[in-house]
C-alpha cells in the first residue's frame, strides 16, 4: 500500500482550510485517510504560528514507515524539527533543463553567435590590413620625394 502525507481540503467556499493527513495514494483527496497529523490555514499570515500545525513525531514516524510527503507538505515538514533535525530535507526544485531555451531559440542564438564571430573576424582583418598598407603608402611617398 503506497502512503502519502498530503493536504485534505476542508472549509467552505472561498475559505479554504486543510488537514495534513496520511492516506493511501489511491484514495480521493478529501476521502478516507489513515491519520490526521496536522492542519494548514492558508488565510493566516505566513509568519503566524497557527498557519501550519504539525505533529512532528507522528510525521517522522510515518515517513520511517515509507509514507511520501507531497511537495507542499514536504516544504512544511522541512521547517519542523524532531531531535534537532528537520523531518524532511526539502530543497527548492532544481530542473536545469526546464530553464534552457527551446530548439529554435538555441538555433537563433547559435546563428547570432556565428554572425558576431564573422563580424569580429572581419573587423580584425580590416584593422590589420590598413596597418600593413600604411607602410607601403609611406614608401612610395619617399620615392617620389627622391625623384
From Swiss-Prot:
An MF annotation (GO) of this entry: structural constituent of ribosome
Keyword Ribosomal protein included in the entry's annotation: yes
Basic and acidic residues compositional bias, start-end: 97-118
Organism, as annotated: Hyphomonas neptunium (strain ATCC 15444)
Compositional bias (Low complexity): 119-147
GO biological process: translation
Matches recorded under SUPFAM superfamilies: Ribosomal protein S16
Protein name per Swiss-Prot or TrEMBL: Small ribosomal subunit protein bS16
InterPro entries to which the protein is assigned, alphabetical: Ribosomal_bS16, Ribosomal_bS16_dom_sf
Alphabetical keyword list: Ribonucleoprotein, Ribosomal protein
GO (cellular component) term, any one: small ribosomal subunit
Family according to the record: Belongs to the bacterial ribosomal protein bS16 family.
Entry-linked Pfam families: Ribosomal_S16
Annotated region (Disordered), positions in chain: 89-147
